[in-house]
């Protein structure tokens, strides 16, 4: 199994390190043709407007949508969730539009208002998961086929729809590998 990490911007290294700890072969994906070389793909946190601009400049956006629609398992964190969302509230931004959610960008505040908390994620075990929110988006609406796996303050923070897992916080910034392991199970 080979897992790609989209290498255009953001927390690329942290996701690669998490996957290496789990003994998984990785590929930092920087070219459209590399999307055919991976069994699953992580879209890291970063800055969503920069990420979509780079994807378009590299002609990777359409290929990425094609691969996701073909069933490529994808794990998006923070800005990656914004890229996948069908709708963005109160902000005009290009997106891939493959996940049936509405998001609000930077909903928890600016960088200085970033925070950590613990969330319950029954799908990965009974122990609380340390969630780090950095300029995180908020999922304000989910489609009927979107499964909510975790919430914070009654808002979804971890959702799944088919082959897509989307997390508004940064699991790659913790030592807890349970969400990466959960994603690998989706890929198998």
From Swiss-Prot:
Pathway: Cofactor biosynthesis; pyridoxal 5'-phosphate biosynthesis. GO terms for cellular component: cytosol; glutaminase complex. PROSITE patterns: PDXT_SNO_1, PDXT_SNO_2. It comes from the Bacteria. This is Pyridoxal 5'-phosphate synthase subunit PdxT. CDD domains: GATase1_PB. NCBIfam families: PLP_synth_Pdx2 (TIGR03800). L-glutamine binds at residues 46-48, 105, 134-135. The active site is at residues 78, 170, 172. Coiled coil: none annotated. Signal peptide: none annotated. The gene is pdxT. In the presence of PdxS, forms a dodecamer of heterodimers. Only shows activity in the heterodimer. Catalyzes the hydrolysis of glutamine to glutamate and ammonia as part of the biosynthesis of pyridoxal 5'-phosphate. The resulting ammonia molecule is channeled to the active site of PdxS. It holds the Pfam family SNO. Its EC number is 4.3.3.6, 3.5.1.2. Belongs to the glutaminase PdxT/SNO family. The keyword tRNA processing does not apply. It catalyses: aldehydo-D-ribose 5-phosphate + D-glyceraldehyde 3-phosphate + L-glutamine = pyridoxal 5'-phosphate + L-glutamate + phosphate + 3 H2O + H(+); L-glutamine + H2O = L-glutamate + NH4(+). GO terms for molecular function: glutaminase activity; pyridoxal 5'-phosphate synthase (glutamine hydrolysing) activity.
